Amino acid sequence: MAVIAMMMTISASAQFYIYFSDGSVARVDSISTVAPAPATNPGAFSVSETKKVTFSPGNLQYIRSTDTWVFASTQYEMVGTDNVTGGIEEFDGPRGIVRYGDDLADKIDLFGFSTSGTNFGVSTSKYFPDYGGSCVDWGTNQIGSDAPNTWRVLTSSEWFYLYYYRANASELMGIAQVNGVNGLIILPDDWTCPADVTFKSGYNSDESGIEKYADYQSFTLEQWSKLEAAGAVFLPAGGYRDASHVIFVQLEGCYWSSTEESMSSSRTFYFVSFEAACLTSMRNGGLSVRLVKDL
């Protein structure tokens, strides 16, 4: 027996009537609003045996002229070679899409390692001591309208757990091209693929190449919207910045962790078309930053 309508008579003493599909009517004296039980978060990702996180809606960006931090407007947005000014964007084979520029652009999304002395890695310095000291998490900034410390960067062990140790980890990652952008899709713990979209986990077994992402699988914007609504995360292959030179765009993604390894290096999460791994990068390299929120 289904409810087909509910009507209210306006008076000093309100009366509510519920009409059922079998023709019966019931009167109730009042209605109280009860909040529904929260649904399972489709974007929950285990990063340890006891901790889950949700990912930010896009990669971190910094606007130099206004000294503001924001998230990319979409998960597949990346600044790419426009992180620098000057030079010409070109394809350089094993280095992917490159630009050998002159200086940082106003909007950037490739950062050196964040410490107190480097303004969160917004620097073209190649001098390792400039990036020395303990990590200062990018999430300590106000990002968009979010208060400081709403977001944080994963540790290296959390990246590794997400990539390797969580249940069915190998089935919950796969390279892809989304709306023309190469990258890595990461699926939440409790994943149900939309009925009219096919997702293939894993990597292209061939050697690295820009075209290998789309060769493996490609999603239109409409298809990606369905995957995203189901909780999927996309990390763009945003490349690498060496001072004012940007290389490896659309070829590889490299994301900082908050874990320091030495005065000159820190731990990262890295992927190309044929693999993903937790590696080490020199602190003066400009890498992508994706933040998370603890659940």
Model-identified regions with their sequence ranges:
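Boundary of Sec targeting at the N-terminus
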Residues: 14-15
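N-terminal signal peptide c-region/cleavage motif recognized by signal peptidases
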Residues: 9-11
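C-terminal, surface-exposed recognition/capping segments
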Residues: 50, 57-64, 140, 152-295
